[in-house]
Amino acid sequence: MKEKISEKEYKALIRKIGKEHFDGEKEEYGDGTVGVWTYELRKYKLKPPVKVKYVTQEQFQEYKDSNNQRLIKIETTLAAQGEQIRIQVEQIKELQIEQKAQGETLKLILQTLQKMSDRLDKMEVKMDKMEEKMDKMEGKIDKIENRMDKMEVKMDKMEKRIDKLESK
């Protein structure tokens, strides 16, 4: 005796036990069910066949319309989200371009600062050399002042001698 089961259960049964275990051919009925040998159903302890419930054309149309409405809502939502994503992608690209420009500007600023630092270093070296020269010049001036002081002392002595000579 053959029993009716759904197409889905039939395919599951075929996957589970393999086609070679069936003695008969698959029989398709007009209501979407298929027939298989009852022995195979009992052997593999499958659930009893599903009873098929019929719906009217009007009920099916209502179901279809409600699904269409849900799909339209989903499509609208997805379209809006897609638009938002597209806008965000454009904003990200703009930000990347702006960030790249800022990076280049920052590089130029850093290069300028480096050049200024190099110039300041050179000026510092020159200032150090000038300070050394100033120190040497101060040393020379000190020597000259010492000589001048010595010369003044000598001149004072000479003046005293001259005064002595004149007074005589």
From Swiss-Prot:
It holds the Pfam family DUF16. Disulfide bonds: none annotated. Belongs to the UPF0134 family. This is UPF0134 protein MPN_524.
